[in-house]
Regions:
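A short, N-terminal "cap"/entry segment at the start of jelly-roll beta-barrel domains
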Residues: 37-44, 54-104
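Structural beta-strand/beta-sheet cores of well-ordered domains, especially the beta-sheet scaffolds
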Residues: 46-48, 82, 106-108, 116-118, ...
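Conserved short histidine dyad/triad with adjacent acidic residue
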Residues: 2-10, 28-30, 90-96, 106-123
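Short, conserved beta-strand element in jelly-roll/cupin
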Residues: 1-6, 51-56, 107-113, 125-139
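Generic beta-strand structural signal
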Residues: 16, 22-24, 34, 44-48, ...
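Short acidic-glycine-tyrosine-enriched beta hairpin
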Residues: 9-27, 122-124, 128-131, 136-169
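Ligand-binding loop in jelly-roll beta-barrel domains
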Residues: 13, 29-58, 149-152, 159-179
């Protein structure tokens, strides 16, 4: 959740309030009844809701809920000004707080300043996607080919590969990277 407050309750007894910068990770598994209600009195409610398809063998697992406050999400700050919030997976040896996920995802919130470059290894067998929600950049897969210019509100999907490269021009870019 980038801005606002959201209350979660579900039939398994889980409850929590998600605040700006926090993450809620829920596994529906064999099924769960839940509600999410905005709690802010005024202002912006801005965030993302993503669904991960479980492997067939895990679709009937018990429901699970994890509320991660913003302060529990580590931020990798590189010397070149790149900031990476690590929700799940690992970057520069820093693990994200969301663990024990059967799909083993990489889930990052990446901010790259103007005139910078970013490279991220993507595990073989994983498809990667980048949703750009601020700014613009050139996204490529490290194959020597020219990248593709992608701007805010656009989604890029990358096939199985080892490397994602992002270059910024006069404006920076912020995006979710999920693999």
């Amino acid at each position: 959740l980038l801005a606002g407050r959201m209350r979660h309750r579900d039939g398994a007894g889980h409850a929590g309030v998600l605040e700006s910068g926090g993450v809620q990770w829920m596994t529906a598994g064999r099924g769960v009844i839940h509600s999410e209600m905005p709690e802010q009195e005024n202002g912006l409610l801005y965030g993302f809701q993503l669904w991960v398809n479980l492997p067939a063998k895990d679709k009937m697992m018990p429901p699970r809920y994890q509320d991660v406050p913003a302060a529990s999400i580590p931020e990798v700050k590189r010397p070149d000004g790149i900031h990476i919030r690590v929700v799940a997976g690992k970057v520069d040896g820093v693990p994200g707080p969301v663990t024990d996920i059967v799909a083993d995802p990489l889930f990052l919130d990446v901010a790259i300043p103007p005139h910078s470059s970013f490279v991220q290894v993507i595990e073989r067998g994983h498809t990667a996607l980048a949703y750009i929600f601020e700014g613009a950049g050139t996204f490529g897969v490290g194959d020597g080919e020219a990248g593709t210019d992608i701007a805010a509100t656009q989604l890029a999907i990358f096939d199985d590969g080892d490397l994602l490269e992002v270059q910024t021009g006069d404006e920076g870019v912020r995006f979710l990277l999920i693999a």
